[in-house]
Amino acid sequence: MQNNNILVVGGAGYIGSHTCLQLAAKGYQPVVYDNLSNGHEEFVKWGVLEKGDIRDRQRLDEVLARHKPRAILHFAAMIEVGESVKDPAAFYDNNVIGTLTLLSAALAAGIDAFVFSSTCATYGLPDSVPMDESHKQAPINPYGRTKWICEQALKDYGLYKGLRSVILRYFNAAGADFEGRIGEWHEPETHAIPLAIDAALGRREGFKVFGTDYDTRDGTCVRDYIHVLDLADAHVRAVDYLLEGGESVALNLGTGTGTTVKELLDAIEKVAKRPFNIGYAERREGDSTTLVANNDKARQVLGWEPQYDLAAITESAWNWHSRRNQGG
């Protein structure tokens, strides 16, 4: 009988762990490969943990030989845009060299199904909104460029090596498992929803809004927040698609609905049932006015349909963060 092992690289992290939950629910056997630099061992609840770095070819070969996965899901990456500007070398080393090492190991092991976590940051500043997959890719920071380079490698490996891949370009991942088993946990935290919830919980002095003079309905930036379980569902569908013989494709993952920063803060205040201190500052360099996905292609190719709205995102995030003790 064919095994149902799926290697989830970076599976101890935020999106990876939620995808393991969904894979297990659909009858797959997740095998987590993670160096735990950003992941959490306690998030590995739906399969074994193989500790290792994506730049360690020997370790990758061992794990692939042991588990013989049918497909690889690759989440492992450094993701903080500000850090990528301060230390681009670390991002190129981890994100690009790490991905190329993983791809070489996959090809050597005869694995031709690969799902890659990419980002709307590969598009850069939007020419039009909502953005579809034909939008030009002109990333504006090292983080976005490392992901774009990996996308080019995947296309070439597909053309010349027979590797089939689904590239998933996320918009703003948010929310948590509704049972509170896993959730968003970054150190340091830079994402808007956890920061605002921490402000509401009194764990930080307040929340800072960068820019109130954007050309939007209330002057603050618009973003497309997508529930992490909707992202996870798309990854499982991408595995199904590849294992059924699907061809390489790049897909946006967003809801197609934009939320302003002020609307997001109102939603968090509603679920927190308390006001919190909000400060205002100048715009941050590189922040786009509006980033919203056109997700028609993902719906068409994967039969995927986002299930959760902003209320579900903020409620599940509040549930997770309010239960968690500060600092873990």
Swiss-Prot record:
List the catalytic activities from the record.
Answer: UDP-alpha-D-glucose = UDP-alpha-D-galactose
Q: What is its EC number?
A: 5.1.3.2
Give the enzyme's main class according to its UniProt record, as a single word.
Answer: isomerase
The pathway to which it is assigned is: Carbohydrate metabolism; galactose metabolism; Glycan metabolism; exopolysaccharide biosynthesis
Q: Which UniProt keywords apply?
A: Carbohydrate metabolism, Exopolysaccharide synthesis, Galactose metabolism, Isomerase, NAD, Plasmid
Catalytic site: 143
User: Which co-factors does it depend on?
Assistant: NAD(+)
- List, alphabetically, the Gene3D superfamilies matched: NAD(P)-binding Rossmann-like Domain, UDP-galactose 4-epimerase, domain 1
GO MF annotations for this entry? UDP-glucose 4-epimerase activity
Binding residue positions for substrate: 119
Q: InterPro entries this protein is in? A: NAD(P)-bd_dom, NAD(P)-bd_dom_sf, UDP_G4E
Which GO BP terms apply? Answer: galactose catabolic process via UDP-galactose, Leloir pathway; polysaccharide biosynthetic process
Q: Which Pfam families match?
A: GDP_Man_Dehyd
Return the CDD domains for the record. Answer: UDP_G4E_1_SDR_e
What does the similarity note say?
A: Belongs to the NAD(P)-dependent epimerase/dehydratase family.
Q: What is this protein called?
A: UDP-glucose 4-epimerase
The protein's organism comes out as: Rhizobium meliloti (strain 1021) (Ensifer meliloti)
